Amino acid sequence: MTPQQREEAAQSLYQAMQSGKPIAPLRDTFPDMNVDDAYAIQSINTQRRISLGRRVVGRKIGLTSVVVQQQLGVDEPDFGALFDDMSFGDAETIPLSILHQPKVEAEIGFVLGRDLDTEQPTHQEVLQAVDYVVPALEIVGSRIADWNIKFVDTVADNASSGVYVLGSTPISPRGLDLSLVGMCLSRRGEPVSTGAGAACLGTPLNAVVWLARTMSRLGKPLRAGELILSGALGPMVAVKPGDVFECHINGVGSVRTEFESNQMNGVAA
């Protein structure tokens, strides 16, 4: 892709985000698009948001679950930026007007207590850098019509980011085997998605290690205070107006969210 084409792709995604009207897959509009192009497009819109006063508070890792990879037809993780205005409190109601074809994923949030700026951080170094973990719900969204995405589409679209909710009781990850934690996501008390830490690259810690190494290689190391969302521990679930979701992760805790009952982007009440 030419620099102008990258700008055009970024603008089309941004307009879709603002209008709530999804667009055709970028891979169809720009057949020569590759992964480097996709991350460049993501970066253009990240800088656009920063210029408008938004602040990057961390990173999200996507496509870490084999189940989710199968759902979307991809075979490797990706990452996107988390902004300060994406955060909602535990049990807070989320307005539907800001969402784009939303789906819920149960994850683990890692908050760093120190920088991870070595070139190839080890698992132990990453674990020691984590201040605490919390259960998290990520409400992913797509600006691509009907979630018709391949890897380059979701990467360009900030890893299909939306908003997120963190649990209110932080705990230390040291002494926890995060590969063994079980997860149950319920809609109004009925289980709709189950999984375990092992579904996330073998353990959510592996996902954070992957991200730390990737960001160091890109010259953008993870910093103290940043939030890292691990990626899904089980299948994602489509949101309906008025839904109430609660996630429980054994040994980590619970987190809850609910959605407005009126119409939202891409879904009719």
From Swiss-Prot:
Q: Among its keywords, does the record have Lyase?
A: yes
Q: In which pathway does it act?
A: Aromatic compound metabolism; 3-phenylpropanoate degradation
Q: Which reaction does it catalyse?
A: (S)-4-hydroxy-2-oxopentanoate = (2Z)-2-hydroxypenta-2,4-dienoate + H2O
Note the InterPro entries from the entry.
Fumarylacetoacetase-like_C, Fumarylacetoacetase_C_sf, Hydratase-Decarb/MhpD_sf, Keto_pentenoate-hydratase
Spans traversing the lipid bilayer: none
Q: What class of enzyme is it?
A: lyase
Enzyme Commission number(s) from the entry: 4.2.1.80
Pfam families, alphabetized: FAA_hydrolase (PF01557)
Q: Name one GO cellular component term.
A: cytoplasm
Organism domain of life: Bacteria
The family annotation for this protein states: Belongs to the hydratase/decarboxylase family. MhpD subfamily.
Protein name listed in UniProt? 2-keto-4-pentenoate hydratase
